[in-house]
Amino acid sequence: AMAELGDPDGAMEYYEKSIKADSSYAPAYYNKGVLLDKKLEHDESLKVLDEAIEKDPKKPNPRFYKGIVLGKMGKHELALNCFESVHRANPQHLDSLFHKGIELAELERHEKAIEVFDKILDKHKGNINVVYAKARSKAAINEVNEAFDLLKVAIKHSKTIKLWARKEKVFEKFYDDPEFQRMVK
């Protein structure tokens, strides 16, 4: 909570004291790992998250967050492995499934990513982030009509998507397309 209240140094000190008091307390390692990531200390974050995983391997959060950090570092195959591991152990953990799809897309395995996004949308049709992610993968494999249909749905529910689409590398090839311009205007 201290980190969210603008005192990351106080939070770090608290986590370190917690670890010193009880070196087996996995949540302190997890929270410290998350905070290190927020401070852009990714390598150190991974080390601490690995300690959290070692202390309590059944908890999904440290492994999930390790996947997030690895993805930020461009280590998409390793990130994918983390998300697959979390999802196998916790099939109801939809965030791990979503991020599995994101990493598949980053690895340009768009057909597989679309399968993952469809699996989520079967259960949660209105998840706009998933709709947008699917639109990105459809655009990447040049299924333009489907990509635009999905993008329209996403934009209808969240104007922020317009901003994302304008900056999204996968949509660059459509910048001169009048329909795309209308959607993101």
Regions found by a protein language model. Give the residues of each.
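TPR/TPR-like (Sel1-like) alpha-helical repeat modules
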Residues: 139, 144-161
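Terminal, low-structured helical/coil segments at or just beyond the last alpha-helical repeat
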Residues: 156, 160-185
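Alpha-helical adaptor scaffolds
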Residues: 64, 68-72, 94-111, 115-123
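Structural marker of alpha-solenoid helical repeat scaffolds
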Residues: 21, 55, 89, 123-124, ...
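Structural signature of tandem alpha-helical TPR/SEL1-like repeats
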Residues: 5-17, 38-51, 72-85, 107-119, ...
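Start-of-helix register in tetratricopeptide repeats
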Residues: 27, 61, 95, 129, ...
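Canonical tetratricopeptide repeat
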Residues: 31, 65, 99, 133, ...
